[in-house]
Amino acid sequence: MPGGRRTAGARARGEVMLLSMSRTQFQDVLRRHPELANAMVGVLSSRLDNTNAQTFRDLTEKNRQLQTAYDELKAAQEQLIEKERLEKELQVAAEIQMSILPDVLPSPDGYDFGGRILPARQVGGDFYDVFDLGNGKMGVLIGDVSDKGVPSAIFMARAHALIIAEADNSTSPGAVLRMVNEHITRLEKSTQFVTALYGVLDLLTGEFSYARAGHEPPLLIGERGDVHRLPHEPGMALGLWEDMLLDENSIRLAKGSLLVMFTDGMTDCRDPNGVPFGLERIKETMKELRSLPAQAACDRLFSTLMDYQNGAKQDDDVTLLAIHAK
């Protein structure tokens, strides 16, 4: 039936016989043989069922693909929202930290101070301060709060404020830190703690009295250029227990000496191979800093540390605070 209407087509591969009948003849055959009509309906129904089943499978698969795409898009949106929330939280923490740090360090006669801080991933946990206590004395403070984020930044702000407030009530560094520890352990409900070193510098005599609450012992460049750690005993961080143990001591800063205080982010900073900077490298670098003012010494130490780090990931804040006796 070239060019005619058809429901199917076939191509013979050999000699065949073809039966041709009109619609009227075909309908007459079906009337005389209804079983043939039933068979044809059965074949067509089976083909329709198979077609419907395949269509259902195709639709089911497309729905599954659409659901997967929707779930992935939803997860990506949630990750983006969480990322934006964390970035905002980190920014708030950094702003709290920067608001605590002094804009300008004092420069009393005979001494100069220097400080540097490099937060890890915009998160603030370290702090430092130098403030006038009156009567020819200066308060010197450096600390490191456990953990990171906004809660730690708030905890840091409270600890800093408590130390400043108690420093007005006592010239004894140990008494100040004990009172602060009492406030923190009784009033704070968090599990955070803070290591700290608080000292009082007598500008007239050069005596530096200090108390160390679990913090890194300072390093001193003496009159002859030798570098050594200050004498130290065991001490505990603020906020751990009400009955705490402090390391208390005092030294005299002779003219030309340089005292450097730092947080453990300095010693723990690692190069691309994972090797920490360590205390000995700080000492070696400090041997070249004897004649420098405090701020220049801090800058040089930071520069040496960054060269050593060489782009490796920074896991903790790095903070320096220095006193130079002119």
Give the residues covered by each predicted segment.
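Short, charged, low-complexity patches
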Residues: 30-37, 41, 45-48, 152, ...
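… and, occasionally, acidic/histidine-rich disordered N-termini of signaling adaptors
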Residues: 74-260, 312-326
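Short amphipathic alpha-helical signal-transduction/dimerization elements
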Residues: 18, 34, 38-52, 160-168, ...
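Regulatory loop-to-helix N-cap segments in sensory/regulatory domains
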Residues: 2, 19-20, 25-33, 148, ...
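Amphipathic alpha-helical coiled-coil "transmission" helices that mediate dimerization
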Residues: 39-42, 46-88
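Short beta-strand segments in beta-sandwich/barrel cores
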Residues: 17-18, 216-219, 266-267
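C-terminal catalytic subdomain
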Residues: 177, 197, 249-261, 266-326
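Cyclic-nucleotide recognition modules
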Residues: 1-42, 49
